[in-house]
């Protein structure tokens, strides 16, 4: 949470970023510390008390002095300037320069945010607790975010292809564990790539609004994909699909490439030979694609019939017996399922 807040504070078009830009242009260098006043004061000495509202121009002027500038936790007030930072020298640091070494140790000891601006290299390094991040220029950030977005679109296309194939097989009652594991694998890849966009969007701030909208638009295409886990989990689903996907997110990239690991997560065992086993879908995902059924109605249908095939075969009289389903809705469910089945068949041709 602190790291997210730090990236937002130094994103383009913020007052802190404007102050950083002014310092970089003058090539004077500097260090800005953000945190609790008492904690920062205990780990620094000397300097002058300022205690005034923060402004980029004032920070720029104060940075002309050699010492660090201390600000409150959200950077809205300047506490003091020209401070000598005195974190423990025993704290390990990978930095070589005096300013950056002190900044890294200060961030680690005080669990605060420190921005170090190099006067020679003209770079900005962000230290947040144990984390370190070198800020990129706006064009570089936009370019990297665009590359990740293009990669994401390709993976979403592959996921949608797998989902369409899975839907056809669900109607045909010919789904194998391989089909399910492949789809879940592609969905998890999409989730991981989409998460890679988050730090770029945070660092871009308002400059990343267009990229954020593009991300939201492409991710809308994956709506309902998480229900694949709910449809094919072997045992009665005591955990939510979200909890199962959280467990999937914990495995590393190499393990994700092995379908046996996904099969084991779904409780079909780790043996790769099991991927030839046929499964029957419960129908959650398909039902969400037909008429606009509420989650409760879908739960009632699955609880009553147990599988998509049983719902497809159920006469109107049986559907009406489900809690919340009347004659009109029963007919819409039947016609909606058959319409979706025909659409998938036509698209496949």
PLM segments and residue spans:
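Residue-level detector of alpha-helical recognition elements and their boundaries
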Residues: 122, 167, 174, 212, ...
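Divalent-cation
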Residues: 1-255
């Amino acid at each position: 949470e602190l790291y997210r807040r730090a990236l937002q504070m130094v994103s383009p078009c913020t007052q802190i970023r404007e102050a950083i830009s002014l310092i970089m242009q003058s090539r004077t260098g500097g260090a800005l510390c953000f945190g609790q006043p008492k904690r920062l004061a205990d780990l620094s000495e000397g300097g002058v008390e300022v205690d005034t509202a923060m402004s980029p121009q004032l920070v720029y002027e104060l940075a002309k002095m050699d010492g660090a500038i201390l600000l409150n936790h959200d950077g809205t007030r300047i506490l003091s300037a020209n401070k000598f930072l005195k974190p423990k020298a025993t704290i390990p640091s990978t930095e070589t320069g005096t300013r950056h070494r002190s900044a890294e140790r200060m961030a680690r000891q005080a669990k605060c945010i420190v921005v170090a601006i190099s006067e020679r290299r003209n770079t900005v390094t962000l230290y947040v607790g144990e984390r370190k991040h070198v800020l990129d220029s706006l064009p570089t950030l936009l370019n990297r975010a665009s590359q990740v977005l293009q990669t994401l679109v390709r993976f979403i296309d592959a996921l949608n292809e797998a989902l369409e194939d899975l839907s056809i097989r669900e109607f045909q009652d010919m789904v194998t564990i391989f089909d399910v594991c492949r789809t879940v694998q592609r969905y998890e890849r999409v989730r991981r790539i989409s998460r890679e966009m988050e730090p770029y969007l945070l660092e871009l701030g308002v400059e990343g609004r267009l990229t954020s909208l593009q991300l939201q638009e492409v991710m809308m295409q994956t709506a309902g994909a998480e229900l694949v886990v709910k449809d094919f989990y072997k045992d009665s689903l005591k955990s939510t699909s979200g909890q199962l996907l959280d467990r999937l997110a914990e495995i590393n990239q190499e393990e994700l490439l092995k379908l046996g690991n996904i099969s084991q997560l779904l409780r079909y065992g780790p043996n790769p030979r099991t991927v030839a086993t046929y499964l029957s879908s419960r129908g959650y995902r398909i039902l969400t694609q037909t008429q606009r059924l509420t989650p409760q109605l879908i739960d009632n249908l699955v609880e009553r019939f147990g599988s998509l095939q049983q719902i497809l075969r159920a006469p109107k009289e049986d559907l009406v017996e489900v809690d919340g389903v009347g004659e009109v809705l029963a007919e819409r469910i039947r016609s909606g399922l058959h319409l979706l089945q025909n659409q998938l068949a036509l698209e496949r041709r």
